[in-house]
Amino acid sequence: MLQCLNDKMVYLKENHKRGIHMVYSQTWDLDSIYPGGITSPELANKYQTVAQDIQFFAQQVAQAQPSAETIADLSDLAQKIGAGLGTISIFINGWASVDYGNSAYGPHFDKLGQLFVAFAAPMNQFKKLLLQLDDTEFAAALATERLRPIQFYLTELRTDAKRLLDDHTEALINQFDLDGQQAWSQHYDTISAGLSLTYTDAEDGQKRQISAGQALNMLDGEPNNETRANIMASYEKMWASAENLTADTLNHLAGFRLTNQKAHGYQSHLEQPLEMNRMSQATLDAMWAVVDANKAMFKPYFERKQQLLGLEKLGWQDQVAPLTHVGDYQPTDVSYDDAAAFIIEQFGQFSPKMADFAKMAFEKRWIEAENRPGKQPGGYMESVPDLHESRIFLTYTGSVNDAATIAHELGHAFHSAQLVDLPLWRDAYAMNVAETASTFAELIVNDANVRGAKSDAEKLVLLDAKMTNPIAMFLNIHARFLFEDAFYTERQNGVVTPQRLNELMDAAQEAAFDGMLDVRHPHFWSSKLHFFIDSVPFYNFPYTFGYLFSAGIYARAQQDGANFEDKYIALLRDTANMTAEELAKKHLDVDLTQPDFWQAGADLIQQDIDEFLQLSEQFV
């Protein structure tokens, strides 16, 4: 699951130039994966087939002698198993997403988890097999025809092997993880699914009860200042009531992770997430240094937005609040079909292949978008490896957030689609570059909306919508990183109390927003799902990387015109085949450890802020 940050956009029907109005289903097709839901006989057969493949793989690895041919055969089998596990995973997760909170899916997640654990043991043995070859022998093996396409991934596996403990200990750690790190992450889901709050609607004075997920959506999109503030106050109070439970969860999840990292030779809590994102500390430092150096540009923007919203103080809930009353312009909701047509059309301005892909995804029902009760909040894209397809989950309400979410997730899916002819291990791109393609797709759609504005008021609303992404990437995400870095530092010395977690988060928000918020959200550590994800530590800085990296690519796209598409696809196809620094150097000829590239992205934000301030002068 990947829960992605939404940007805001407004689609204008006047921009719809197509003569034929397509009608698309808003429910996805999961039956083409396994028909019949979670009771599908084909799903049951797949469980059995994958289990048998894992058993056979384990037998083969146990008796293997290191050679290029043996490594190639085992790699093929491992990738087949990985594809099967990935396909089962998206299927179960897909059904659980549209029937959120149903405990019937729990046994399936447990069964899937057991398969992953069973696969991990022989995979660790396979990694150690690679170490039995000396450097010269390994290099010769990688040069063979069958291994050449996956040589980068195999090299990473061989490096991983150097950290591994004995097989028995590694097997125990993986088994403990089911009731350790994974269990604590699932426990957080159970806690959050059971939370609700009551708020007062300022327009009619009525008290309304909503879930935690509904509250989060309303905090981003509620136009009434007082109602939004009421929800925020109740939201903070709700998470405060659960702080002992969520603090226990966060502490134990982090404790397991730190112990595991230490056992495997990691010297700091940042070493593993940087390794997972195939980037260096120097690149991370250069990126954050540019973010810090450019925060001041947001201050006049927030001051002007505070005026436009008519607020005495700017609170956490106001950072991406929509502008709904500017001049005589009134944003209108957009139908799903209109949003689809606009996305397809605008993708086509940069890449006909992107447009054709998006059209296919809508037509083949790869997207779950229907607004109905019982769905989990947020959005994600997951690949279906066995079918060489993708599935996209979101809830489309016609609001200013939702069409951009579709574009974002289609960007992810297009990225994955460019790799279907390559081995599965060439599809294992890291989160930081994964967020590049999705954010690039959003930029296309949002800039098209701004260009098509019919008045200054409309353009101002669209620019403000576009600003939600840089606010998230420069400020909100940085607050998460600063908190998590401080928390993991303190957690090494023992459990961190809820009160101290609040203090760390408040300090992180103060620093990240440079004092621009009058009212903060100290229980953000408790309310934000990303802190509780077991599979990915530091689920934050890759977003900022992806945003700024995509800004650089977008600038190149505008320069290259018709020559851009092939260059872009070539970059995407290399995302799992080299480090982030190597990717940037090869395809953009830039050095990510230096500030220049990152500053170019910040300069684009400054341009939007300058235009926002100039346009808004007449409305205050």
Model-predicted segments: where are they?
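Post-HExxH zinc-binding segment in Zn-dependent metallohydrolases
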Residues: 430-458, 466-468, 472, 546
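Long, K/E/R/D-enriched contiguous segments that form extended
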Residues: 313-342, 415, 467, 471-473, ...
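Short pre-active-site segment immediately N-terminal to the catalytic Zn-binding motif
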Residues: 331-334, 387-406
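C-terminal, non-catalytic "cap/extension" segments appended to globular domains
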Residues: 4, 126, 130-133, 152-165, ...
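Catalytic zinc-binding patch centered on the HExxH motif and its immediate surroundings
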Residues: 329-334, 367-388
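A well-structured
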Residues: 12-329, 614-620
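Inter-helical turn/loop segments and adjacent helix faces that build the functional surface
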Residues: 281, 350-353, 417-425, 447-462, ...
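Active-site recognition of the HExxH zinc-binding catalytic motif
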Residues: 265, 397-417, 438, 443, ...
